[in-house]
């Protein structure tokens, strides 16, 4: 089974009609941010913090839940976790918000680099809810486990898996396919574990991508072919498959991509990416099927490139 996938440049949205399917492409750029934290000094906690805590000792679940409110950041309402810094009046703010502030959000005083050691000690005995509790996570964690859990939490919101950065949607896994069908109607879905992904007009200049969905084994997979210019004047194609699901679910599958023609064969086999991981990092690290334009021409037919895609259970 095959369907033509027309290219779509990576610019806002432009879909062209194909033989029952269209592709999606947008101009992409990657930006990275960095932050730095200044040196901190240790000091005794202010009287306001320590007096609040002295009457709230204990470690049962109910008291732990009550104590978490003491760690709420007044700016983002996330939790302030060690290392905990306070202003000269004893007010707390989380590290993320602190880097964006010039004064204490509570008293407008200066942001001193003073460690609140008493609150840090209390934090080690308090269990915090996962930040994705609003999406259904019921985990209760000590602060040393919180960040690691949240990075892989099965309840954390999924980003739109479509290539490019134009779509800002995010939501629970069970709404991803609904989002794709409603907001990305140009993407066609083919049924079966063996299909042919036919990308049209591969000779178009610039950054272009082709996208198709494949449905089998009760799951949905997104097939992505991107053409990028990683180095000046050197264009490359990157082909990869991602599962609309978690990494744990992705471990149950393996995909195989194959270019075939003119007595030549080029193959790639790997575990599909999960949409939590996305495809950007894999493409950046060339952890996918990679070939340049000269190789593409060996397998292309009148500017169209067919890729055999096979999904298998492990």
Curated annotation (Swiss-Prot):
UniProt cross-references to SUPFAM superfamilies, sorted A to Z: RING/U-box, TRAF domain-like
Region annotated Disordered, chain positions: 1-55
Family under the similarity heading: Belongs to the SINA (Seven in absentia) family.
Gene that encodes the chain: sina
Zinc finger map (RING-type): 73-108
Protein name: E3 ubiquitin-protein ligase sina
Zinc finger intervals, SIAH-type: 125-185
E.C. no: 2.3.2.27
Subunit composition and interactions: Component of some E3 complex at least composed of sina, ebi and phyl. Interacts with eff.
Domain of life: Eukaryota
Molecular function terms from GO: identical protein binding; ubiquitin conjugating enzyme binding; ubiquitin protein ligase activity; ubiquitin-protein transferase activity; zinc ion binding
Coiled-coil stretches noted in the UniProt entry, renumbered to this chain: none
Main subcellular location of this protein, as a coarse class: cytoplasm
Biological process according to GO: enteroendocrine cell differentiation; positive regulation of proteasomal ubiquitin-dependent protein catabolic process; proteasomal protein catabolic process; proteasome-mediated ubiquitin-dependent protein catabolic process; protein ubiquitination; R7 cell fate commitment; regulation of R7 cell differentiation; sensory organ development
Role played: E3 ubiquitin-protein ligase that is required for specification of R7 photoreceptor cell fate in the eye by mediating the ubiquitination and subsequent proteasomal degradation of Tramtrack (ttk). E3 Ubiquitin ligases accept ubiquitin from an E2 ubiquitin-conjugating enzyme in the form of a thioester and then directly transfers the ubiquitin to targeted substrates.
Tissue specificity of this protein: In many ommatidial precursor cells.
Enzyme class: transferase
CDD domains given in the database record: Sina
Subcellular location as annotated: Cytoplasm; Nucleus
Domains (record comment): The RING-type zinc finger domain is essential for ubiquitin ligase activity.
